[in-house]
Amino acid sequence: LLKEKLLHRWPRSEKGRLKTDDRTFYRFSAVNEKIAAFRNSKFIIESRTLKGFCVGKDGRSRAPLNLFGQITGRTNVSTAINPFGAPRRMRTIIGTDKDHYLVYADWKSQEAVVQAYLSQDKNMIAAINSGDPYLYTAKKVGAVHKDAVRKNVEKERELYKQSFLAIGYGQTPYGLKNKLGISLPNATFIHSQIVRTYNVFQEWSKNIIAKANQRGYFITKYGWKYWLSDREIANPRRLTNWPIQSHGSEILRRAMIDLDERNFEISMIIHDAVLIHCKRKDWRQMRKDIAEIKQVMSDAAEKVIGAPIGVDTEIIKESYVQKKDDKKRWEQLYEKLIKAKSGRIASTREVD
């Protein structure tokens, strides 16, 4: 990392250690070929540590969710026996039979919407209502023309998306500089733009942390608490992050309950999404079911934060279709596994 000039940009855990999760490697693999190659090798090597998915006679894999496994109330699923805990490429094995299909439904810009409506920042709510809060932010601060369309300003949109989310979790100009790989003056300028634009959110965040410190705990709408201790110095970013993530987890749990009460079969809950197993019907009825899923999930958000959140859906008719990069990595791993299996079979025959 030092040789590649990435050490200062590389994110760290709350204990100060360099992060080694797949999400971090994925982010840096887009800007550094060596990191991309290392990520690929790491995935293949670590695949040997997978304990295997617990598949029953019915073809279902079952793994514990470990609800409330994190301080924010989010799940903490196993990276060894849960396909959604393992690297994304492992999702290729997810599929269904000819009589069913899967619906992968996820909330659009969930964290940004939660920030906006918990804080009641009118500028941030306007950004959400625009349909693309990150492009709106870039336009609002004058980084792109007010009539710009996403496909023509993708680079600028991504810059302000990363900045919007990072600053929402307490990122400083120095942290933003390292995260984005830009100069400190540029990072300071972008930081000041976003803080000024969404100053109501910034004040709300400070006030809710002050209130939590005063009474000794944070609390969500439905009563999940995070107790603060005078024996431990909490990471400031954790305190800023907690209200957003904890209410995101409450939205997910509310949706899980409501979908179950509507007799939808939930296969898995993910960070900001739900995987639902549906019986194949005529196209009109399937569309009706999907529309109901989206409505239930949107309503779940409104019950928690007072505003609905839009939902995107992906239909999986046979097996999970990966993005180009992850699909390629999976094919490489699968090829190596087949060769290894063939080698073991040949060795067994020689012994016999």
PLM feature spans:
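Short Gly/Ser/Thr- and Asp/Glu-enriched loop/turn motifs at secondary-structure junctions
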Residues: 1, 158, 191, 268-273, ...
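Extended, well-ordered alpha-helical scaffold/bundle regions in very large, multi-domain proteins
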Residues: 1-33, 169-207
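Acidic, glycine-rich two-metal-ion catalytic cores of nucleic acid-processing enzymes
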Residues: 1-151, 210-273, 290-299, 333, ...
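Catalytic palm subdomain of template-directed nucleic-acid polymerases
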Residues: 115-117, 172-185, 274-294
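Short, amphipathic alpha-helical "recognition" segments used to contact nucleic acids or chromatin
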Residues: 158-169
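Polymerase palm active-site segment centered on the conserved acidic dipeptide of motif C
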Residues: 194-208, 281-352
